[in-house]
Amino acid sequence: MAGIYLHIPFCNSKCAYCGFYSLPSLKLKERFLEALKTEIVMRKDYLHGLIVNTIYFGGGTPSLLTIEEIGELLHLINNTYPIGNDPEITLEANPDTLSLEYLEGLHQLGVNRLSIGIQSFFDNDLQYLSRKHDSHHAQQCLDWAKLAGFDNISIDLIYGLPTSNAAQWNQNLDIFFAYNLPHLSAYALTLEPNAILTKQIELGKVQPVNEDDALRDYEILCRRAAENGYLHYEISNFCKRGMHSKHNASYWFGTPYAGFGPSAHSYNGNSRQWNVSSVEKYCEAMSAASRSPLKVGARRAGDSKEEPCFESPLPPLEGGNTKCGIEKEILSPEQHYDEYIMLRLRTHWGIDLKYMKREMGERFSTYCEKQAQPLIAQGRLSQTREFLYLTDQQMLFADGVAEELFW
């Protein structure tokens, strides 16, 4: 099993809270798509012939691509990689980019899962977040998606907003439950260092974030999701039984995946790769690679991260460095252990000590159990038989618990 992720870095505009790599312009779209197609073909051996069961268009705003452009990418992937029966094909979308005609086109292409960035069903929240859609369009696009034939729909909501309160957050959840959607991703508003909202708060232009409000909303979310039959299967994700995101779950289970596009990451079981976080440099790299074999250099744990350590067919870029656009790190056994802890602790499946002993060795499972005992005694971690996991309340402190379990 394997997955494919395509990073589409374009947006209509930059949302105030966003810390992801994206461009609020489409002027490089045509050049980018050619580069993306080059990478898809160039790296066809990366997954070693594994069957691809999930394809995920993330961003940015993938729904800024036309139906024809998405169709060309899917056709290329189908002709380049072995695709499983009934693969999960997800496309992230923003309400302001959607129409009934567009959604019908996606469905006809074989896209069978939507992840829609609603964020809130209230205009005051949407304005605070600098979203382009309004509350009417937020609900209209869900109606359209159902009319177009989609039944696997996820939406994003943000809680802990200073423009909201407990009553309004409950109303947001009321609307979600009324649509009977199978999946919800809900995130506390966080202040990313490079986000517009962070600067606005620092300058006193908008209301600051209150952590107590976020905690209140999280508790409401967990309680109401359980009451309505949703499984809290990952810190920020809730689903009806069997309707979890197969693609995202593959990350948490260590399934190999290839990431294409600027800033995209890949993992093949032994190493991680990541692409340069610049559309222009990415396009330059793929253009050069199409004319000359691309060599990806390996960096081991402990190596300096200051300079790229791979060969490149590119001429020198800024500062005299050369970059082929892809960098690679070979993971040590200790790094594999830490990644397993970090990823699995986020989920309701938790850490499987038997799996750890079998796949990583007894020294790792013994160490993990030893580190876990004081955390269990303190009520910060739970254990059932060979599984270590976090309850809803314990998930609030997942990062701190993971750090104490790390090698």
Where are these regions (language model features)?
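Short amphipathic alpha-helical interaction segments
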Residues: 362-374
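Short, amphipathic alpha-helical interaction segments positioned at domain boundaries
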Residues: 395-407
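A short, conserved structural fragment
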Residues: 376-386
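Local cysteine-cluster metal-coordination motifs and their immediate loop/turn environment
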Residues: 9-20
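C-terminal scaffold of the Radical SAM
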Residues: 1-3, 22-45, 50-291, 321-362
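Minor-groove-contacting beta-hairpin "wing" of winged helix-turn-helix DNA-binding domains
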Residues: 387-391
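Glycine-biased, low-complexity coil/linker segments
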Residues: 295-298, 306, 318-320
